[in-house]
Design a protein with these regions (language model features):
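Signature aromatic-anchored transmembrane alpha helix within multi-pass, membrane-resident enzymes
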Residues: 18-30, 245-249, 372-414
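Transmembrane-helix signature of polytopic, membrane-embedded enzymes
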Residues: 127-169, 188-189, 204-208
Length: 685
């Protein structure tokens, strides 16, 4: 009796072990990416576009103002969409149709903040691993005959688990997870669940999850429509499939041609401008697709587009190519991304490719099963070896190969601890010193309008009117981080606007600390506090790489830091921080220019250091004081050479005569100098 009970217990444990492993992988993903996403927000690296405005729209929805936000209201800036021409620029439905945000707003009853959105996004993405596992188990389980050896039985149980890390480590999902919050990032799990229900003959689940998926974004209806066609033509569920296809495609068309124009006042989606190279209207684009297909084919031959398409396949370890029929279901999103003139959409970064991942995973599962079944049948027909053994051994080989390829691609392009891009930053002193300002703003009555810089917007968005600086309108307060991204304007324009506001618009400085500015309308105070410049001071700093290079006995470069940033894009993004010391008073406003070369000595990029010009010019540097200057993250990490030059005022970046010379070593170590010894190379060890 005890022996039988023990055998039963062992049998249950063996069968539950794969599912338990899937659960552990999901929990690990949630813990790691939840922390990464939260830490990114805590360090002021989330932005108005898109966490800030989504958070405000969700908060307003909960408070009886559905889908209202003020990010683009009275916009004093230009974007790649015509926000100035919107009839109702304060209604989100004019930009995207994402009804799921109304349901998400109820979660704010539990925790009222953008952290809710970030954790929700992480958890839902992770839960997509469950239908991946179930789809694989269903597909490979159909090959079980009951005559497998113990080894083959164990393999049957564990093979589906291999597709879970393939999903969780896909760079497009990780990119979406660490790109603020987007409702469309919730769609992969919903699409996978819908497909799982379809393939296991539970149409109610297919319809239910498909219905929720289409509420994530206007284009997701096209993906569900393609799944409906799969149900009709592959699964032979004609009525179910065609009804779902027509309803879902109809919803997408209604969203783009009716709902969005109703609120925007435009003829169609405002994002149609990103496809202007193919026509100025949906009808013109379709006409050109039929009459001038070469126009589209030429676009697909662009190196950046080919690289993007190849990266998608590598996400599945290349296994998705084994079952191209499934990949057809992803065609709408692939086309939307590939044909866009906005290169971020076909970079593999951001949230744009998240909804493609489900079909890559399904194609990988079906492709492995199909090829191994064909191989096993061919071998068995020729009586070479047991066909069933060939099936399982071929499956193992294919999955192992696919995982190796996917892991290699993930190491290069992902952002998990297994990637070269992984970074878990501590909460910085700069972010900590922003908290008193956030708390002060949050104590203001919610009807008081404010204007905020992009990276501070998500932290103070819970009020009816929060403008994105440089829009001021009727704002009573302006809150800026001058070291953060100045977009949608340049650093120089930002500084000019602040100066004009202080000089002519009756604003004064209410607080200034560590690079943060709080301006108040009607205040008679125009000086920055001494602590405002603390963000540029680095007393006692220890650069990663010591340099010791002097410029004409005026400036000393003590060293630099080279920090990789966790951004999914073809090129490695890095943040370069340099440490300088003025050796004597600097009367002129010197400029720092960074140059990036390839191995063939071709100049690839020129990047000016703008903070030192506009917010902390060199004539403010005290002799002997260490000054820290950080460039914004740049996609230059794979370039082998970077150099810096000190330019005299009012000289061009390429003007050799305008560069400060000579450059000499203060440590006795040789320096690597470029371009007539006017540029110092920052040599990494």
């Amino acid at each position: 009796m005890r022996l039988a009970r023990a055998r039963t217990t062992n049998s249950v444990a063996r069968h539950l072990a794969p599912l338990f492993t899937v659960g552990l992988l999901i929990v690990a993903y949630i813990a790691i990416f939840g922390l990464l996403s939260l830490r990114r927000h805590q360090n002021l690296r989330t932005n108005a576009l898109d966490l800030g405005y989504t958070d405000q729209a969700v908060w307003n929805t909960l408070h009886g103002r559905p889908f209202r936000f003020s990010t683009y209201l009275d916009a004093a800036f230009q974007l790649d969409i015509p926000v100035q021409h919107f009839e109702k620029p304060d209604v989100l439905l004019g930009y995207h149709v994402e009804p799921i945000l109304a349901a998400i707003s109820l979660l704010y009853l539990l925790h009222d903040g953008p952290e809710t959105l970030l954790w929700l996004q992480t958890v839902v993405i992770a839960l997509g691993a469950i239908p991946v596992y179930l789809i694989a188990r269903h597909r490979f389980g159909s090959r079980i005959t009951g005559h497998e050896s113990p080894l083959e039985s164990r393999f049957v149980r564990w093979l589906p688990v291999a597709f879970v890390p393939l999903y969780l480590l896909s760079p497009p999902l990780e990119a979406a997870n660490l790109s603020d919050f987007h409702a469309v990032a919730l769609s992969p799990a919903l699409l996978l669940a819908a497909f799982c229900f379809l393939e296991t003959d539970r149409p109610w689940g297919f319809v239910a999850f498909g219905l929720v998926a289409v509420t994530c974004k206007e284009e997701v209806g096209l993906l569900v429509a393609m799944m409906g066609l799969w149900a009709a033509f592959v699964r032979r569920r004609w009525i179910l499939g065609l009804c779902v296809a027509v309803a879902s495609a109809g919803w997408s068309i209604l969203s783009v041609l009716v709902i969005m124009p109703h609120y925007s006042g435009l003829d169609a989606s405002p994002f149609l401008a990103r496809y202007g190279q193919f026509g100025d209207s949906p009808a013109a684009i379709l006409q050109n697709l039929v009459q001038r297909p070469g126009l589209f084919l030429d676009w697909l031959r662009r190196p950046d587009v080919l690289r993007y398409l190849g990266g998608l396949l590598l996400t599945s370890g290349g296994l998705a190519v084994l079952y191209p029929l499934v990949l057809l279901m992803a065609l709408p999103s692939v086309a939307i991304n590939s044909f866009s003139v906005y290169d971020w959409m076909h970079s593999g970064g951001g949230h744009y490719s998240a909804s493609i991942v489900p079909f890559l995973m399904i194609a990988a599962i079906y492709g492995v099963e199909w090829l191994t079944r064909m191989t096993g049948g061919w071998v068995k027909a020729r009586r070479l070896v047991r066909g069933r053994s060939v099936f399982w051994s071929t499956s193992l080989a294919l999955v192992a190969l696919g995982l190796c390829i996917a892991l290699a691609y993930h190491h290069d392009s992902g952002v998990s601890p297994l990637s070269r891009r992984f970074v878990l930053d501590p909460v910085s002193e700069h972010a900590q010193r922003a908290q008193p300002l956030f708390e002060w703003i949050q104590r203001l009555p919610p009807e008081v309008p404010i204007s905020v810089g992009s990276n501070l917007y998500p932290h103070v968005a819970h009020r009816e009117r929060v403008y994105l600086f440089p829009t001021v309108s009727d704002a009573q307060f302006i809150l800026l981080d001058v070291t953060g991204p100045s977009s949608p304007v340049g650093v120089g324009d930002q500084r000019q606007i602040v100066g004009d506001l202080l000089d002519y618009a009756q604003f004064g400085v209410a607080a200034s600390d560590h690079g943060f500015l709080l301006l108040e309308r009607g205040l008679d105070q125009y000086r920055f506090s001494p602590t405002f410049y603390d963000v540029f001071h680095a007393a006692g700093a220890h650069p990663q790489v010591a340099v010791g290079a002097g410029w004409s006995s005026l400036l000393l470069l003590e060293g630099f830091d080279w920090e990789v940033r966790p951004v999914v894009r073809p090129a490695l993004s890095v943040e370069i921080t340099t440490y300088w010391r003025a050796l004597s008073p600097l009367d002129d406003g010197y400029r720092l220019i960074f140059y990036f070369w390839d191995d063939d000595r071709h100049l690839v990029r020129v990047q000016p250091e703008e903070l030192a010009v506009h917010w902390f010019p060199s004539w403010l540097w005290e002799p002997g004081q260490v000054v820290k200057l950080t460039l914004p993250p740049l996609p230059v990490g794979d370039l082998p050479h970077v150099g810096v030059a000190v330019l005299l005022p009012r000289t061009e970046d390429s003007d050799v005569e305008g560069r400060l010379m000579p450059i000499t070593s203060t440590t006795g170590k040789p320096l690597s100098l470029w371009d007539q010894d006017t540029i110092l190379e920052l040599v990494r060890p």
